Amino acid sequence: MAVGGGLTVTSLMRQSARYNAHRLAVRFKHQQLTYAQAWQRGVKLANWLLALNLKPGDRVGVLEDNSLEAQDCFLGCAIAGLVRVPLYARNAAASHVHMLSHTDCRLVIVAAHYADEIEQIFDQLPVLETVLIRDETYEQQLMACSDKDPEVILDPEDWFVIRHTGGTTGNPKGVAYSHRSWLAAGRDWFYHFPPMEAGDVCLHVGPISHGSGYLYTPTWLAGGMNVLVDHFEAEATLELLSSAQVGYLFLVPAMLSMLARHPKARELSFERLKVMQIGGAPIADDTALLAREVFGDVLYQGYGQTEAVPVCMMGPKEWFSEVEGSKPLRSAGRTLPFARLEIRDPDAPEIEMALGESGEIAILCDGQMTGFWNNPAATEERMTSDGFVLTGDIGRLDANGYLYVLDRKDDMIISGGYNIWPAELENTLLNHPAVIEAAVYAIPDVKWGETPAASCVLAEGAVVSETELIALCARELGSYKKPTSVFFQKTPLPKSPVGKIQRKTLREPHWAGQSRRVAGN
């Protein structure tokens, strides 16, 4: 078989399927498939989709959890040359409509238990022609499709997937990855990792349409096995890490905290574990140190955004070392060899700030967007004339090149003329052993205009007072930065569909009835 088109996700996955035909490619619960079996299912779905009058380059919306059928979709769209548009299960209907309409999706593939969400908005989507519901008839229909590879010829610059930003302010923005940029992102994720070998196992506790998906393709290309779970549960994850001899996985800090603090973590063996990749949110020092004690030197931290990823990375050797003039434990790592990172003047983004000065983080890497999908105004706002992506994050670089992320540009609190970054306070609060979640935001104040307030979730059975936490922040950061109020809640903090804490949701009730609020807050 000879299929032209250069280095694409599809051509490389096809090659790996051929060379690893009898190895295990995927496992979900008690089901598992070899590479040959998984590829054949992908080919069948590709032919099914092409028979629905779709053509390469068309966009296909997808609403699903991790499952064997999710892998069918990943492979089937790649083989057919279709562009996946993953939807988020926690999205409101209006977000589904926006994501499907502005990408002109002609078809949606949806798991049966989410079908109502798509059927309810079908009439609002004039371009949408077909909804493929994966119900009890799916398997029979799939098996009836041809298993002859359509051998669609693709170019490395053809679009592969459109992921959407978290949408914490305004509508989510579409970020399109070409085959080339998706492969580059996967390569750069694995640059610092111990080499993955055929037969190694990568566990996906989050959807492969989210952050964990960056590890899916490299695992397949290396001849490894992707193990999928449809939801995260700490004890079950620990048992799977041990029994499946997992080598690699992606976690957000809250998940790592739950794993490290679970009694089972000290009872089980994780001898094959090589990498616990942490990302998506700041991690508390105590959590990182405890996880290292429990799991060993397997923690890796990365920094990037949907728009450009990864840019920074740090392995355990650096993360937990002492470096004169730097605090690696508090940093997001150092710039990868194949990327550039600069601190730009927030008011004049063409100007680079001096080392040690804070400003907007600007990034440039192979795995970045060329612009937002169908949104030239947002593209112009977020991309510089020399090709850098403006992240909206405020940070600084020290003399050794370590990046410290201070906060989101739009979340800055201005209290009595002083600039206060919520993330700095959140990190301090999270370093208290009783606090497992923290969010800081502005509330109105008659004297100062606005002041920081914090909402915290405590570990089970933990006790700490508002006074203690306020004193901790004053001691660590200075009195003018301390929160004036700390609110405790028993339920998890509100999060966006991609897992980011929504400060806006916590902040808004405090501003109800106010005639104005400070810009950006």
Which role fits each region the language model picked out?
Residues 2-10, 14, 24-67, 71-75, ...:
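Conserved AMP-binding/adenylate-forming core of the ANL superfamily
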Residues 4-6, 21-22, 146-164, 171, ...:
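Conserved pre-ATP/AMP-binding loop-to-beta segment of ANL
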Residues 14, 51-52, 79-141, 153, ...:
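Structural core segment of the AMP-binding/adenylate-forming
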Residues 34-37, 160-187:
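Conserved AMP-binding A3 loop
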Residues 70, 91, 108-110, 241, ...:
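AMP-binding/adenylate-forming catalytic core of the ANL superfamily
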Residues 183-201, 209-248, 262:
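Conserved AMP-binding/adenylation subdomain of ANL enzymes
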Residues 338-362, 381-382, 399-400, 462-466, ...:
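Conserved beta-loop-beta connector loops within the AMP-binding
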